[in-house]
Amino acid sequence: MSDTEIQAELVAVARDLNVQRATLRLISDTSVFPIAYEHCEPGTASIRDTPRLDMSKQPVVLKMQAGASQVVEDDCAVATNDPGYHEMREMFGGMKAQTVTANRDADGQIIGLLSVHDLTSPRTWTDAEAARARAAADRLDELTR
């Protein structure tokens, strides 16, 4: 695993998708999907050291655990009524839109989550953008195994 290559992929996907933040969360024995790697565009606050959230109860993670390989949210403000989600959204800088893509092991268990966050405005993600996020997640999976 090369930290430099992982960071380079996060930078590339953030710039390709014109987002302000890209994070890679990896499975851990000590917490539920902590942020292992993060890229923030200039002027964007890091969320790596935000207070720990119970990610196991977050709606996106629950969708992933139910089998979704990717969750695309065009407008995070209306994505769910879950108060914990909106608390997280504000802690994460007022996230306006996001795409989260899962990587799984051979048994189908989630081992990684690539998140890309648009902090500027809601947006309609295109199929090409979702595919770019999937390609980045696949590359990150290769780099972290």
Could you tell me what each predicted segment is?
Residues 10, 85-86:
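Generic structural marker for isolated residues within well-ordered, non-membrane alpha-helices
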Residues 27, 44-83, 90, 96:
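Regulatory sensory and allosteric helical modules in signal-transduction proteins
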Residues 96-105:
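A short, aliphatic-rich beta-strand micro-motif
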Residues 118-136, 143-145:
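Regulatory loop-to-helix N-cap segments in sensory/regulatory domains
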